[in-house]
From Swiss-Prot:
It catalyses: acetate + ATP = acetyl phosphate + ADP. It comes from Clostridium botulinum (strain 657 / Type Ba4). It is an enzyme of class 2 (transferase). InterPro entries: Ac/propionate_kinase, Aliphatic_acid_kin_short-chain, Aliphatic_acid_kinase_CS, ATPase_NBD. SUPFAM superfamilies: Actin-like ATPase domain. It is found in: Cytoplasm. This is Acetate kinase. The lineage of its organism: Bacteria, Bacillati, Bacillota, Clostridia, Eubacteriales. Homodimer. One of its GO terms (molecular function) is ATP binding. Mg(2+) binds at N7, E383. The keyword Signal does not apply.
Amino acid sequence: MKILVVNCGSSSLKYQLIDMTSEEALAKGLVERIGIEGSILTQKVNGEKYIIEEPMKDHKKAIELVLKALVDKEHGVISDMSEIAAVGHRVVHGGEKYASSVLIDDEVMEALEDCVKLAPLHNPPNIIGINACRELMPKTPMVAVFDTAFHQTLPDYAYMYPLPYELYEQNGIRKYGFHGTSHRYVSSVASEMMGKDLKDLKVITCHLGNGASLCAVKEGKSVETSMGFTPLAGLAMGTRCGDIDPAILLFMERELKMSPDEVDTVINKKSGVLGISGVSSDFRDIEGAAEEGNKRAKLALDVYHYTVRQTIGAYTAVLNGVDAIVFTAGLGENSAASREEILNGLEYLGIKIDAEKNKQRGKQIEISTEDSKVKVFVIPTDEELMIARDTKEITAK
């Protein structure tokens, strides 16, 4: 059984064709600059690159070219489109309606449109991608897998903001959380590595990329997460500010005479480690600058590590203890220095790190010592595989 996994952005599209027998990706691809001059599709099969450069006015044209690349006689991996058993779509926001993945029909599409107000940047391109696939592959079942779904198990006291209750009832203003597919994947892998049932474990998962969030997993369910109503909340990130005093935004508008759009740009695109360091949003650049003595770069890293450490401490309280901590995503998988800094100061939990194992980059590995009271893992995330598994399970029903 072969499943196509699609992740649509506003002008880009990532895809993988996964053979579910071996759970291996037969092809991985990226389409860039959709609707802009210089559109390009890059597909990788066994390390070999295949490139298509031609105008793509919209996502429908992009998906046409994806299918063309997959069945290409020389560079493709299937002989006919009918080999694609189903398509799994990453959808950022499922609102309160969806606590799990769902088979897409017209009713689901209406519900996705209703969620646009909650994710105005992300859901529209997700919807466009689904519509394009449905048009080009009308007989192929499609499944929506939501970033928010895993966190729908949060208790009401964890997702409710202390605002007038009507804002929640009438406008859906509450904590939703994101990166759910990643948190779900790495927590399940951690339980396998420990040889235990996830339902018997208390796990804190740290998805640390340019966007970053933590999740507290108890009895296999998300009970707390750091992102909120939007992916802006929680930790300091690459360019996002994370949790700040909301009155700062009013100060920026009233005293600094900034428009809402200008404030939005500052808190989403000019803040985080980029804002503090003035160097970059790329942690490799900031680590390099800090090593060369750049004080603001060092401060940016200190702030970042502090917010992650602080949140791990809080989630230990939420869970009443912790059995395992997992690091994943770009920084979590590749920065030994960041992992070490984050865990410094958590010795009271009985965490002990094996310095040699911690030097490994991008590998699935346990980095804690044998006598560490808390297991610490680095687990490369695989959201596409999780989407494919859900798609297989739902279309088999």
